[in-house]
Amino acid sequence: MAVKFHLCLLLIILVGMGAHVAFADLPLCDYPYGACFYRADPCPDDMPVECPNYFYCPQQTDRCCCYE
C-alpha cells in the first residue's frame, strides 16, 4: 500500500514539474512589463497590448497585458 502511495505522489510531483517546465522559457508577466488579468476582461487602457507570446501568467484563466 505504501509503495502505491509513493508512486502516486511521485507521479503528481513529476506532472506538476512538467507543467512548470512548459512555461520556463517565458518570463513571468509582472511589473515592469505588464500584469495578469482574467481572460474575459479587456486589457486596461494603460496596458492595451495583449502579450501571451512573450510572458506567462501562473493562472491558466489569466492572460498577460503589457505596457506599450
From Swiss-Prot:
GO terms for cellular component: extracellular region; nematocyst. Contains 4 disulfide bonds. It is found in: Secreted; Nematocyst. It comes from Orbicella faveolata (Mountainous star coral). One of its GO terms (molecular function) is toxin activity. The keyword ATP-binding does not apply. Residues 1-24 form the signal peptide. Induces neurotoxic symptoms on zebrafish. Has also been claimed to be implied in calcification, but tests on homolog proteins suggest that proteins of this family have a neurotoxic function and not a calcification function. Keywords: Disulfide bond, Nematocyst, Neurotoxin, Secreted, Signal, Toxin. Belongs to the Cnidaria small cysteine-rich protein (SCRiP) family. gamma subfamily. Its main location: secreted. This is Small cysteine-rich protein 5.
